[in-house]
């Protein structure tokens, strides 16, 4: 504007009122008429200096217009009827041509865009005219910054200020570029020279064109800055939701952060030092924690009315099918950006093209692919010389990780170099160079990926190899994948079974799939035949921790996920073949025709001329599916070692197996024998049965015999099972203990005919070695093949360990007696250490006792819910019915206010969600509750009801199943309603509909024995106009009514929680509990099998795995503590496994 024109009045507008404004070159703050500030709230006070002296005046923040342009500025009041405008508030009025250091070749950029555009004819001419019309929008100078005309941002810090940081050493080559940037920003007011107690180091970063970018390390500042809730949408979500029209445009907002002003109170936080001078930012700095979110939120809000627009930080994407519509919307975007004060860089923009680059990908009609720029960067990669270069290369490769099926496996050797680096020095080999080139070649030839279609279901295909898992995502019915995922197993996961590896891969894939699903179902295809059957995988066959299994199994209950078996998975046929581990090969014992348990033992020979006396034990059993002994052998071997006895026992079992049709399993507790058979025997056969030192094997005849048997019958499987394990800890414990007992007996047979009843423990006892628990002052001797102990109360038999559970069980099963009775019965004939504990262990495995015995301990006392402080804070709702049909209605919805007990009754034809919502909509026209409590009926747990409550801002609460005490208030009202209706409808039960208003009025005016008031009095403060009403309250003024109401409510008290019974138990995590059977029939079990407590919600509610394997919240009233748990500790897992297997 010509300076002479500033003498003329300017057109202004405040709150719709037009008035005049005058330019005042001496004004430091704008002054507006007092009348426009009467309803405004001052933000601070300042001292104003005029010709009459200094005066303190309040400052307001006001929005008004000057010359039709919106101005937001700090103002003070004036007595005049016009505005005095400060030049700093309307700098654009006297705008001088911008002069910065480097002019950009704008003409070349426009010519390039016109040449590359897919627009033709008049549309192309229209685009050229838009370039001229919006010339002020384009970036003309490097480092040119816009000015967003909005309220400045305030940078809030926490209670602790950030610590100033020292400046890093600066590369001398960067100084010239950084100084140019600082000079240009000073000219535009983006930087000011100002001292501060804070300092942030400058970190110059080289650009591809040889210049340097000024970056500041704000990490210390960001530690103290609260993260705002609104954050940028993930790029994957944006790519899946963009419109892919024929014409696509991308715009780059130049230096967008620097267009947003910050408050002067925030300047000090942004300070940095350059060449001895300290500077502060007046705009949002790059590197500040909340800059991307604040900037993106503004641009998104600015362009929200324009269709088919997506924004990610400073990148804008626009697409349409029609060229005319595309140009019209482009002009609208240009206009909005110009008026908002932004600047667009045409250097990085692409306009009206069929393929554009957005978020680092090449966007096409079908999907996304790697850009030519990215591929060129890959081709320019050279072998790294130090650790930093290697990390930079891996970061570049990682951007394209979803384009290769086995990316993680390919880059793992390169990541291993980082782990072995010595400081910044790395060891790089020709193999590493070959691997790097292989990855680059695969990425450059990678096909485009399809984008996620939110209208169809998501397909996830999973497979595994011994070292990694492979995942592919598809849109339903599509052939092109959305992305690939590759997961390399950890050292622990490599040891998993194949099923567990697949479950691990599924878990990793579902974490991503739940993001990609976009509300649609997820169909998971894998080589697992049945996901439900793997829940029954025995504990011994599980190598993963139980917490992993719980996580994996939780997916079976997710309604968003469906699992399918796919034997072929043709897309994954190139994956290396999956090799089975030993656990995966071994079937359940019931799948074998016969199972042999073998063991060998040796003792010191009683003849001094001989060193040992060995024996072997073999047990032939079948699982039908119960453990059933077919035959046993206890064979003395004479003067031999225990090792020979172990080999001889396996040889004996192999010879017996030759006579059996079908697969045979041989179990030995000798690791040496099992490993030798499975790994070394083929080598021994090939080299003539010599060991690694080329010496003949010991017991070579027996190894040859075993090799011949396996060759004649290849379906003989020999495995190792650790011996002397707790009872029922694995499938093979019982058979192993039996074989151990037989082997010990065989080793004691020298020249006698009686087979002693011994095992390894009793063998030590007879040799004068006292195992733990056997007192030394007792006398122990072998009599008639049994070990006897002489104690003060007489002689007793000490049975072998393997026989003890059966002895206890036999005594207990006579009458299913309790602990003490069973103990007395057993101890009358037998004795061993910890006999009483063993009795408890065996009894608590008795399934019949566990599911039928009554609870021995009482539940904790009922918790009193807190009474709400106001009416309408919380409602209890429930249905009564079905009742006899009356006017077409069968049910009544009962709504009770928790604070007052006031009741509303709504007749309904069915207890449905729609009927519930309809009734509650009428009630919420009076007031909206904060909480609604109900049982878990279908009408209250549906998604429709949840959506209705969410829209109303209501929180839903549910009581635990089979526990009406949780909704005691509404349950008591239900009984009162039924009782009253029954009395009023004697002889005419179908007339209840007409009496509902009478019942509601009666209940709301009935006195509560505990509070001494009626619900009507607690809600309104006065009586209703009914018989026996207190007439004094009907004539009170409104103030007196409110005073009386406050007095009544404050006098209420919450009944105290009753004291706990001395036999009450308190739940804790890990306790074994049993859930009550909901409706047990006569002579049927009253309790389900034991299950551990997973989580304690409160003293009255816990989370367990129910008998169907589902995670459920239940009340302790429906649980009993499993018997014989000391101090609430759980039983051994072996006991639970045994019961689960039995059930």
UniProtKB/Swiss-Prot annotation:
Its EC number is 2.7.7.49, 2.7.7.7, 3.1.26.4, 3.4.23.-. InterPro entries: DNA/RNA_pol_sf, Integrase_cat-core, Integrase_H2C2, Peptidase_aspartic_dom_sf, Retrovirus_Pol_polyprotein, Rev_trsase/Diguanyl_cyclase, RNaseH-like_sf, RNaseH_domain. Residues 590-748 form the RNase H type-1 domain. One of its GO terms (biological process) is establishment of integrated proviral latency. GO terms for cellular component: host cell; host cell cytoplasm; host cell nucleus; virion component. The keyword 4Fe-4S does not apply. This is Pro-Pol polyprotein. It comes from Simian foamy virus type 3 (strain LK3) (SFVagm).
């Amino acid at each position: 504007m010509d300076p002479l024109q500033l003498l003329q009045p300017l057109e202004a507008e405040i709150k719709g009122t037009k008035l005049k404004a005058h330019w005042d070159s001496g004004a430091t703050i704008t002054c507006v008429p007092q009348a426009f500030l009467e309803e405004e709230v001052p933000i601070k006070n300042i001292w104003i200096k005029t010709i009459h002296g200094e005066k303190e005046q309040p400052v307001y923040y006001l929005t008004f217009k000057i010359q039709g342009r919106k101005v937001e500025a700090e103002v003070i009041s004036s007595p005049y009827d016009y505005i005095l405008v400060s030049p700093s508030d309307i700098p654009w009025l006297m705008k001088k041509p911008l002069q910065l250091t480097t002019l950009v070749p704008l003409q070349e950029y426009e010519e390039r865009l016109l040449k590359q555009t897919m627009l033709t004819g008049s549309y192309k001419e229209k685009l050229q005219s838009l370039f001229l019309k919006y010339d002020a929008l384009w970036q003309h100078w490097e480092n040119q910054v816009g000015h967003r005309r909005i309220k400045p941002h305030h940078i809030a810090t926490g209670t602790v200020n950030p610590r100033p940081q020292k400046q890093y050493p600066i590369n001398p080559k960067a100084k010239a570029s950084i100084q140019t940037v600082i000079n240009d920003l000073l000219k535009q007011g983006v930087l000011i020279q100002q001292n501060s107690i804070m300092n942030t180091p400058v970190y110059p970063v080289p650009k591809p064109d040889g210049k340097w970018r000024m970056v500041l390390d704000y990490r210390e500042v960001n530690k103290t800055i609260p993260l705002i809730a609104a954050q940028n949408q993930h790029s994957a979500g944006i790519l899946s939701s963009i419109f892919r029209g024929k014409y696509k445009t991308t715009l780059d907002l130049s230096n967008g952060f620097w267009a947003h002003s910050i408050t002067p109170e925030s300047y000090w936080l942004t300070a940095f030092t350059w060449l001895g001078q300290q500077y502060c930012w007046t705009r949002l700095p790059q590197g500040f924690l909340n800059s991307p979110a604040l900037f993106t939120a503004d641009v998104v809000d600015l362009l929200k009315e324009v269709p088919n627009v997506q924004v990610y930080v400073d990148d804008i994407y626009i697409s349409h099918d029609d060229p005319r519509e595309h140009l019209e919307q482009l002009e609208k975007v240009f206009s909005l950006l110009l008026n908002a004060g932004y600047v667009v860089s045409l250097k990085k923009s692409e306009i009206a093209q069929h393929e554009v680059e957005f978020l680092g990908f090449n966007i096409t009609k079908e999907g996304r692919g790697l850009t030519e720029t990215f591929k060129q960067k890959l081709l320019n990669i050279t072998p790294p010389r130090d650790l930093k270069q290697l990390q930079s290369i891996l970061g570049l490769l990682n951007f394209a990780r979803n384009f290769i099926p086995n990316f993680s496996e390919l880059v793992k050797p390169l990541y291993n170099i980082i782990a072995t680096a010595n400081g910044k020095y790395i060891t790089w080999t020709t193999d590493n160079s070959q691997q790097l080139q292989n990855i680059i070649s695969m990425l450059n030839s990678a096909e485009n990926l399809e984008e996620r279609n939110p209208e169809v279901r998501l397909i996830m295909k999973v497979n595994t190899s011994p070292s990694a898992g492979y995942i592919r995502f598809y849109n339903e019915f599509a052939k092109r994948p959305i992305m690939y995922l590759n997961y390399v197993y950890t050292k622990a996961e490599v040891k998993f079974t194949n099923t567990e590896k697949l479950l691990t891969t599924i878990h990793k894939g579902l974490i991503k799939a739940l993001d990609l699903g976009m509300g649609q179902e997820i169909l998971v295809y894998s080589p697992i035949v049945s996901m439900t059957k793997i829940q029954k995988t025995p504990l011994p066959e599980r190598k993963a921790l139980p917490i992993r299994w719980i996580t994996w199994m939780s997916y079976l209950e997710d309604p968003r996920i469906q699992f399918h078996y796919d034997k072929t998975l043709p897309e994954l046929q190139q994956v290396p073949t999956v090799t089975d581990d030993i656990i995966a090969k071994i079937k359940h014992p019931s799948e074998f025709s016969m199972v042999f348990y073998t063991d060998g033992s040796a003792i010191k020979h009683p003849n001094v001329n001989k060193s040992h006396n060995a024996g072997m034990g073999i047990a032939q059993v079948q699982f039908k599916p119960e453990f059933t002994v077919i035959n046993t052998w206890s064979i003395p071997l004479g003067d031999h070692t225990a090792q020979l006895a172990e080999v001889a026992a396996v040889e004996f079992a192999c010879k017996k197996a030759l006579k059996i049709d079908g697969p045979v399993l041989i179990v030995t507790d000798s690791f040496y024998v099992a490993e030798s058979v499975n790994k070394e025997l083929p080598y021994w056969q090939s080299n003539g049965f010599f060991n690694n030192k080329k010496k003949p094997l010991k017991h070579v005849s027996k190894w040859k015999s075993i090799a011949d048997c396996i060759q004649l019958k290849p379906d003989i499987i020999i495995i190792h099972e650790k011996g002397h394990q707790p009872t029922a800890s694995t499938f093979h414990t019982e058979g192993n203990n039996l074989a151990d007992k037989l082997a010990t007996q065989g080793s004691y047979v020298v020249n006698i005919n009686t087979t002693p009843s011994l095992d390894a423990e009793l063998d030590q006892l007879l040799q004068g070695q006292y195992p733990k628990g056997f007192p030394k002052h007792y006398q122990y001797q072998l009599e008639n093949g049994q070990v006897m102990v002489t104690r003060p109360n007489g002689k007793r038999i000490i049975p072998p360990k393997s026989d003890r559970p059966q002895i206890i069980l036999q005594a207990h099963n006579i009458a299913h007696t309790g602990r003490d009775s069973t103990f007395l019965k057993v101890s009358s004939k037998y004795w061993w250490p910890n006999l009483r504990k063993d009795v408890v262990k065996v009894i608590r495995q008795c399934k019949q006792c566990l599911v039928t015995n009554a609870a021995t301990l009482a539940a904790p006392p009922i918790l009193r819910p807190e009474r709400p402080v106001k009416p309408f804070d919380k409602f209890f709702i429930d249905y009564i019915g079905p009742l006899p049909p009356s006017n077409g209605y069968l049910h009544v919805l009962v709504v009770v206010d928790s604070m007052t007990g006031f009741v509303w009754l709504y007749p309904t034809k069915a207890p449905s969600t729609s009927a519930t919502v309809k009734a509650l909509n009428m009630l919420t026209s009076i007031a909206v509750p904060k909480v609604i409590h109900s049982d878990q009926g279908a009408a209250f747990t549906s998604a429709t009801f949840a959506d209705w409550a969410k829209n109303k801002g209501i929180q839903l609460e549910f009581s635990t199943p089979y526990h009406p005490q949780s909704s005691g208030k509404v349950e008591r009202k239900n009984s009162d309603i039924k009782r009253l209706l029954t009395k009023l409808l004697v002889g005419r039960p179908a007339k209840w509909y007409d009496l509902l208003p009478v019942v509601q009025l009666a209940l709301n005016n009935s006195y509560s024995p505990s509070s001494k008031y009626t619900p009507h009095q607690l809600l309104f403060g006065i009586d209703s106009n009914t018989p026996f009403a207190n007439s004094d309250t009907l004539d009170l003024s409104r103030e007196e009514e409110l005073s009386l109401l406050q007095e009544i409510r404050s006098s209420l008290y919450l009944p105290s929680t009753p004291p706990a019974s001395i036999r009450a138990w308190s739940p804790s995590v890990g306790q074994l509990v049993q859930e009550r059977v909901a409706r047990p029939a006569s002579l049927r079990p009253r309790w389900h099998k034991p299950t551990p407590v997973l989580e304690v919600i409160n003293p009255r509610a816990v989370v367990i795995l129910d008998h169907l394997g589902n995670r459920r919240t239940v009340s302790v009233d429906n649980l009993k503590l499993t018997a014989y748990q000391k101090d609430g500790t759980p039983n051994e897992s072996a006991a639970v496994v045994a019961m689960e297997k039995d059930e």
